[in-house]
Regions:
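Basic, nucleic-acid-interacting segments
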Residues: 1-196, 213
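Long, charged low-complexity interaction segments
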Residues: 196-215
Length: 215
């Protein structure tokens, strides 16, 4: 909980907060793009363990989102935890997006975008949904909190379902899994075994050998 990942932006370095990371079990996936009016269920991944990273709402553009995802992918691949292939489903990203007027302090109503199978599709979906929400607000309409499916071929999105609140997900504990207590000593032991991350190694080389950023 309460971690973060540093990215490079046009304005310099920026830290994107990570609210939490938790483990889930894949239930399968819906395939929408092969038929125009039919969705099918693919259970090939059913039961596969996955890790969900819940990010803080710190990103302000499609470029920042892509920079964040690329940094996450680099770290995960470097650690050997996953090959992070979006087209094969070993890395996935759902995008929650809202707009607000300049100077406003409260976030607007957010929507969640799904069916994003590449970084380019994610960037296009963000730009498309941003424009859609701005257009609704300028027309005096309200943005509905909902989950939308991105169609990259049509470069547009479609409403899938109204967005549920937390209680609608019906969370319940798994009775066959015993609680695991993670001690500070165990965490320290794991951290001691971690390899030096690529970015940390790069910074160390730059300092030790006086290598400029250009090189």
């Amino acid at each position: 909980r309460n971690g973060g990942v540093e990215i490079e932006t046009a304005g310099g370095k920026k830290t994107i907060g990570i609210h939490e990371i938790h483990m889930e079990e894949d239930a399968g996936k819906l395939v929408h793009d092969e038929w125009e009016d039919v969705s099918i269920v693919d259970y090939n991944r059913s039961g596969v363990p996955l890790i969900e990273i819940v990010s803080e709402p710190d990103m302000r553009s499609a470029d920042e989102v892509i920079a964040y995802l690329e940094k996450l992918r680099m770290i995960i691949q470097y650690l050997g935890a996953s090959d992070c292939k979006l087209n094969e489903g070993s890395m996935r990203a759902d995008v929650n997006l809202s707009v607000r007027e300049v100077g406003a302090t409260e976030f607007g109503t957010r929507t969640e975008m799904k069916n994003l199978n590449s970084f380019k599709a994610i960037a296009r979906a963000i730009e498309g949904e941003r424009e859609r929400q701005i257009e609704l607000i300028e027309m005096g309409k309200s943005v509905v909190q909902e989950t939308r499916r991105w169609d990259d071929n049509k470069e547009s999105s479609f409403a899938m379902r109204s967005k549920e609140d937390a209680q609608d997900y019906r969370y319940f504990p798994e009775p066959d899994l015993v609680p695991i207590v993670i001690s500070d000593e165990w965490l320290a032991e794991v951290k001691a075994r971690e390899p030096e991350l690529r970015t940390a190694k790069l910074e160390r080389y730059k300092k030790e050998y006086d290598i400029p950023d250009y090189d």
